[in-house]
Swiss-Prot record:
Hydrophobic repeat HR-A/B: region residues: 119-192
GO molecular function terms listed in the Swiss-Prot or TrEMBL record: DNA binding; DNA-binding transcription activator activity, RNA polymerase II-specific; identical protein binding; RNA polymerase II cis-regulatory region sequence-specific DNA binding; RNA polymerase II intronic transcription regulatory region sequence-specific DNA binding; sequence-specific DNA binding
An annotated GO BP: positive regulation of transcription by RNA polymerase II
Composition bias type Basic and acidic residues, residue spans: 426-437
Main location: cytoplasm
Protein name stated in the entry: Heat shock factor protein 2
Tissue and organ distribution: Isoform alpha is expressed predominantly in testis while isoform beta is expressed predominantly in heart and brain.
Family: Belongs to the HSF family.
UniProt source species: Mus musculus
Keywords: Activator, Cytoplasm, DNA-binding, Isopeptide bond, Nucleus, Stress response, Transcription, Transcription regulation, Ubl conjugation
Region (Disordered): 298-325, 418-437
Amino acid sequence: MKQSSNVPAFLSKLWTLVEETHTNEFITWSQNGQSFLVLDEQRFAKEILPKYFKHNNMASFVRQLNMYGFRKVVHIESGIIKQERDGPVEFQHPYFKQGQDDLLENIKRKVSSSKPEENKIRQEDLTKIISSAQKVQIKQETIESRLSELKSENESLWKEVSELRAKHAQQQQVIRKIVQFIVTLVQNNQLVSLKRKRPLLLNTNGAPKKNLYQHIVKEPTDNHHHKVPHSRTEGLKSRERISDDIIIYDVTDDNVDEENIPVIPETNEDVVVDSSNQYPDIVIVEDDNEDEYAPVIQSGEQSEPAREPLRVGSAGSSSPLMSSAVQLNGSSSLTSEDPVTMMDSILNDNINLLGKVELLDYLDSIDCSLEDFQAMLSGRQFSIDPDLLVDLFTSSVQMNPTDNIKYTKSENKGLEATKSSVVQHVSEEGRKSKSKPDKQLIQYTAFPLLAFLDGNSASAIEQGSTTASSEVVPSVDKPIEVDELLDSSLDPEPTQSKLVRLEPLTEAEASEATLFYLCELAPAPLDSDMPLLDS
């Protein structure tokens, strides 16, 4: 064998070991010369390997053969059957052939496919992967903690929603009970009806609650159909007849001077008042299908109350109504009859008048004044806004105090009796007198309940009744004071609807005597200073 520097020492020693004849009993070429055989591994490892190599380990020899590309040859017939340990072992390489030692240069030791640089790069990549995995793990833990928090918050929110739903249902039940109570309160106490019937008190002995005076003039006629004389017809507007009670017509005239009003004398019969110059252009028509009476109209100079009622108007009147006409609904008899019977009649008359709009307006007051309502429920005592009571107890046809109202002064011409039906109207001289537009002075005496709720106590009402004769319509010699009364008393702002405000009464105001006095339910006969309209 030719020595070559390109052939590794292991291959040179192996070639020499196989070529020598004295070692053929341990290692030799195969029959075809393409491979070599190791006949006895144990003896070969103990006797031959130490001579050529520095070890006697057969496994190390086989490992070096594998490093140079030698492969162990396994025959088909013996591949399945396990060979004996001491049997021959054959190794083969494409460039290791018998008699071709020049091919040994082509046998190269296997070099690892990975380079150190590549190993470093792989290590860096592995570090990056590990760090990213750690970050992902941290994020996952954070997300899990957040998820647990969200779950707990969701559970608490659902609990709160269930509690709120229960509270809402309970509140709805409370509101439903409150509404039922208010409906009962309205039906029992008549606080809502805007069409509540009130007796018309036109006497001048009661204390005037406001500086509003009403002068009624009448003119006798022969039939039941009466017309209102007037110089201008454009001021009249027709209105639908709502009930069979007293209706006040307002005749708008712009051209009359202020004059004084004479005293209307009393008679023991039904009286008709006629005048040529009368204070306002107002006609009052009353249905006489039933025997209803109005109180006697008295002048400012008379201090004694009227004893005989005044029959006014007829149901057959066809005179037109103004846009500012006011309908006054009569009430049941409030004289000395049984209070329980009287209240039952009022309830029966007014329950049918309750409308949806009025009830809804009253129910809206719950949102405005819940604390006052609670105080009323606890003490079962309440008071009402006086401005609202004025709106409640007036007629359903609202009249703006600044619309189509004129102030005139006229003189009474005489009285004439009739028992059928009478219509009041003004004379032509009264229509020619000078007037103040948008203002009309009307005198009336309301219940003490209204006066009390407007801010006057019961004692003030009684004191006002004793001085009524001095506070009625001004006399002929004081026309300037009437103007001042008009300017100071009439509110130029339009009437606005108000809600009921319930306030607790004091102990003095809530006493039994005071409440009976306010409601005109005193068991004793009423004072002669307060004659009522028996309707």
